[in-house]
């Protein structure tokens, strides 16, 4: 063998990863790489780059879970090569999926299914779940209008301040979005303004059970009752879809007396994120329909796939089964008792933060993390007319220097002059961690007080997460 080749081969085998030739070059970013490299070197390059990401546990902007126990990691690893859509090849994974649908339907008080299987599906997240719920609303409305001999070219959807997925739905499926705007003193959809926006072309009303801007619940029952009166007055029957991305896995455990789900007859479908307060890893959502009549069969496809026949009503197709299996693990592991304990712990942290932050500045609280008002979030603004010598953007920027990602942002609609700060409390953000946040909060306030000339420059660099 050529001596140079032998030397190169020996080096490739024996060099440490930090002595390897490949690690002394800049990782390719614009062209497909020409040559291979050792697996440990490729891993080291990527692993090192990921250190530049923020610390997920300190991300108090996200609604998504940032802590999973080791058994979830094991189950995800076991399922990484199982395709969720291949029901025939992975029948037990498919059975677990159906069990989860039944469990979620039971949690949300869906009527007992005629054939023993609840109507619903797992999704990649609550956004896909919203899309599916919206599609079913449009199809049901169109069928009613066609039966009455009326035009179907101008559908509209009525909602309050919603997550961007509903704007996408409206654009993709050619539906007019009648979003009731936020305004000072009225940050949610109220019955009066909702009714003013409704007509016979309204495919449905979508309350958000856990508004992303503030964390408060947009309570469905008053809206539902107003729609009952609207039907009595006009004869127009309007369905509801509940976007319970966050609240769907909270209220059943910590505020069961809130009537928001299928106990309301107009509620035909509900969507939620498994990977938010459902405690599943990222990539899990759920949508449940009241019954088979609520899901138009035109949306259900029976397709041949790798030798099998499956019925599917999802937008995404191939994806790993691990998220569903991990969700089932959480359901089995915790049950109602365990979920109640975990969610109550998050609310206790939120209440503690709200009480302590109230002592530190001239703040007006929009959400204090109480189970009867919303999700475990703390949202506040500076009191009108008060000038503490800093903005919430300044405070957000200072906290970020310590690794805390706490968003400051303006509200939407007619309330864009209101700047708020929002802190999300989730599993894994325990009381001791909250105390560390408060220490850094106080240190940030002291710095801003000592350096007034540096204030006011943070707004352009601040981030939001709504």
Curated annotation (Swiss-Prot):
PROSITE patterns, per database record: DDC_GAD_HDC_YDC (PS00392)
Known cofactor(s): pyridoxal 5'-phosphate
Reactions this protein catalyses: L-glutamate + H(+) = 4-aminobutanoate + CO2
Pfam families named among the record's database cross-references: Pyridoxal_deC (PF00282)
Keyword terms: Decarboxylase, Lyase, Pyridoxal phosphate
Modified residues (N6-(pyridoxal phosphate)lysine): 276
Induction details: By acidic conditions. Expression is regulated by a complex system involving RpoS, cAMP, CRP, EvgAS, H-NS, GadE, GadW and GadX. The level of involvement for each regulator varies depending upon the growth phase and the medium.
One GO term describing the cellular component: cytosol
Positions annotated to bind substrate: 62, 83
EC number(s) on file: 4.1.1.15
GO biological process: glutamate catabolic process
Source domain of life: Bacteria
General function of this protein: Converts glutamate to gamma-aminobutyrate (GABA), consuming one intracellular proton in the reaction. The gad system helps to maintain a near-neutral intracellular pH when cells are exposed to extremely acidic conditions. The ability to survive transit through the acidic conditions of the stomach is essential for successful colonization of the mammalian host by commensal and pathogenic bacteria.
Family in the record: Belongs to the group II decarboxylase family.
Protein name according to UniProt: Glutamate decarboxylase alpha
Native source species: Escherichia coli O157:H7
């Amino acid at each position: 063998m050529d001596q140079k080749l032998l030397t190169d081969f020996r080096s490739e085998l024996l060099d440490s990863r930090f002595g390897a030739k490949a690690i002394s070059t800049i990782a390719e970013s614009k062209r497909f790489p020409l040559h291979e490299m050792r697996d440990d070197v490729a891993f080291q390059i990527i692993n090192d780059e990921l250190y530049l990401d923020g610390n997920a546990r300190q991300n108090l902007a996200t609604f998504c879970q940032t802590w999973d126990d080791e058994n979830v990691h094991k189950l995800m690893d076991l399922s990484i090569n199982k395709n969720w859509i291949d029901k025939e090849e992975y029948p037990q994974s498919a059975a677990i999926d159906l069990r989860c649908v039944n469990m979620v339907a039971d949690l949300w008080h869906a009527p007992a299914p005629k054939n023993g299987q609840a109507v619903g599906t797992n999704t990649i997240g609550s956004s896909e779940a919203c899309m599916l719920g919206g599609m079913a609303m449009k199809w049901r409305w169109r069928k009613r209008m066609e039966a009455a001999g009326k035009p179907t070219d101008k559908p509209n959807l009525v909602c309050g301040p919603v997550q961007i997925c509903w704007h996408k739905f409206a654009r993709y499926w050619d539906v007019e979005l009648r979003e009731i705007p936020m305004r000072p003193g009225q940050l949610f959809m109220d019955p009066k303004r909702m009714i003013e926006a409704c007509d016979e072309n309204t495919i449905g009303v979508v309350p958000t059970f856990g508004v992303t801007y503030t964390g408060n619940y947009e309570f469905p029952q008053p809206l539902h009752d107003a729609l009952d009166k609207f039907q009595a007055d006009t004869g127009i029957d309007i369905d509801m879809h509940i976007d319970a991305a966050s609240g769907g896995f909270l209220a059943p455990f910590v505020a069961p007396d809130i009537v928001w789900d299928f106990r309301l007859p107009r509620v035909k479908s509900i969507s939620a994120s498994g990977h938010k307060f459902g405690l599943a890893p990222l990539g899990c959502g759920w949508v449940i329909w009241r019954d088979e009549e609520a899901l138009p069969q035109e949306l259900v496809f029976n397709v041949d796939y790798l030798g099998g026949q499956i019925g599917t009503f999802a937008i995404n197709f191939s994806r790993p089964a691990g998220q569903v299996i991990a969700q089932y693990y959480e359901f089995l592991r915790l049950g109602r008792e365990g979920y109640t304990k975990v969610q109550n712990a998050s609310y206790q942290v939120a209440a503690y933060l709200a009480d302590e932050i109230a002592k530190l500045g001239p703040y007006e609280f929009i959400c204090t993390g109480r189970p009867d008002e919303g999700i475990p979030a703390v949202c506040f603004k500076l009191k009108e007319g008060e000038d503490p010598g800093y903005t919430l953007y300044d405070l957000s920027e200072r906290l970020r220097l310590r690794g805390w990602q706490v968003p400051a942002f303006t509200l939407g609609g007619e309330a864009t002059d209101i700047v708020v700060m929002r802190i999300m409390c989730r599993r894994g953000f325990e009381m001791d961690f909250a105390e560390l946040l408060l220490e850094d909060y106080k240190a940030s306030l002291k710095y801003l007080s000592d350096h007034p000339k540096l204030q006011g420059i943070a707004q352009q660099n601040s981030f939001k997460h709504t």
